[in-house]
């Protein structure tokens, strides 16, 4: 299973229609003047944010998007029809960059937001434009211009306020499933989650807050190891991170350090993002082992971890209280 959150496409505006050479042909007007109409303008290519889309999967199978051309002009100064814009739907949270230069062209965040990425060519001029005192029967017209053509890089970043991070198998999918109505695939082996899962958790006010279960990181993720860069970018837009540590892992403290190191190496302000350290799977620990592990995690991170059992539903109210407090809701 592959989460398509990057795509490369080419967009091409429609070509303008040609102007034409024509003359009035009317009864009793033996020498009618020029009447060639202009060509219509080529259609633009427009990207539009759509809240019903979750991935860029559609762009895996189609890479070239060409808008329709304008129609050629007609006699009697009739202008050819201009092309209607080609509207391409993309998920909310899609960044659009010029593939060659890397320049950010736009960030489509809100539903219905639009960005014109290739303008159509202007229509050519008919010979009616070239009538003058010195030339009463011009035979000149111009062709329509080509539309713009650009290679684009699309990147999708999840729009979630809270990101749940941790090494594979830390229990992130279980946590988001019990906190929200999301039902991600859950199994007891690493890398079950290959697609970021979104869930809406209700605040005390009744409003919803979007949580994202970010697939498991591994050492070297910031340099692109595993699924690193593909998923670290999704954390950038979150306001708060829940760092989940598996209490049943061979080295929970080492796991904590791996994730912290990757956040620091990736940059983009992630290491300074407000974060809650949460120790999951308390059902695997006796009292002495729990207290010892909590002390070691606190010594390593400088923060006292919250203790929960996602599978048993324990400690979740206290966790959410901390989340709402840090979000200021």
From Swiss-Prot:
Name the UniProt record assigns to this protein: GTPase Obg
GO MF annotation list: ATP binding; GTP binding; GTPase activity; magnesium ion binding
Occurrences of domain OBG-type G (ranges): 160-328
Cofactor(s) this protein cannot do without: Mg(2+)
GO CC term, one of those recorded: cytoplasm
UniProt record, GO biological process: ribosome biogenesis
Localization (cell): Cytoplasm
């Amino acid at each position: 299973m592959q989460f398509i959150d990057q795509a490369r496409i080419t967009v091409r505006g429609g070509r303008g229609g040609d102007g034409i050479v024509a003359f009035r042909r009317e009864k009793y007007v033996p020498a009618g003047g020029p009447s060639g109409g202009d060509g219509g303008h080529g259609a633009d290519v427009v990207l539009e944010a759509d809240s019903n889309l979750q991935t860029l999967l559609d762009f895996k199978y189609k890479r070239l998007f060409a808008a329709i051309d304008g129609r050629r002009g007609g006699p009697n100064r009739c202008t050819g029809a201009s092309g209607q814009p080609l509207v391409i739907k993309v998920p909310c949270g899609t960044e659009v960059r010029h593939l060659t230069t890397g320049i950010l062209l736009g960030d489509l965040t809100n539903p219905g937001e639009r960005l014109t990425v290739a303008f159509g060519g202007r229509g050519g001029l008919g010979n009616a434009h070239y009538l003058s005192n010195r030339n009463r029967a011009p035979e000149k017209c111009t062709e329509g211009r080509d539309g713009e053509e650009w290679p684009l890089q699309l990147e999708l970043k999840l729009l979630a306020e809270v990101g749940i991070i941790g090494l594979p198998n830390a229990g992130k999918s279980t946590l988001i499933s019990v906190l929200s109505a999301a039902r991600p695939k859950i199994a007891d082996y690493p890398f079950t989650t290959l697609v970021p899962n979104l869930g809406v958790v209700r605040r005390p006010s009744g409003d919803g807050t979007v949580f994202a279960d970010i697939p498991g990181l591994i050492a070297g993720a910031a340099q692109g190891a595993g699924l690193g860069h593909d998923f670290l970018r999704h954390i950038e837009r979150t306001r708060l991170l829940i760092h989940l540590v598996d209490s049943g892992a061979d080295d929970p403290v080492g796991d904590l350090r791996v994730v912290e190191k990757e956040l620091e190496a990736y940059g983009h302000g992630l290491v300074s993002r407000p974060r809650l350290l949460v120790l999951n799977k308390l059902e695997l620990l006796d009292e002495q082992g729990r207290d010892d592990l909590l002390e070691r995690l606190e010594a390593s991170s400088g923060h006292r971890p919250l203790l929960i059992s996602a599978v048993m539903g324990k400690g979740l109210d206290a966790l959410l209280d901390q989340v709402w407090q840090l979000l200021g809701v």
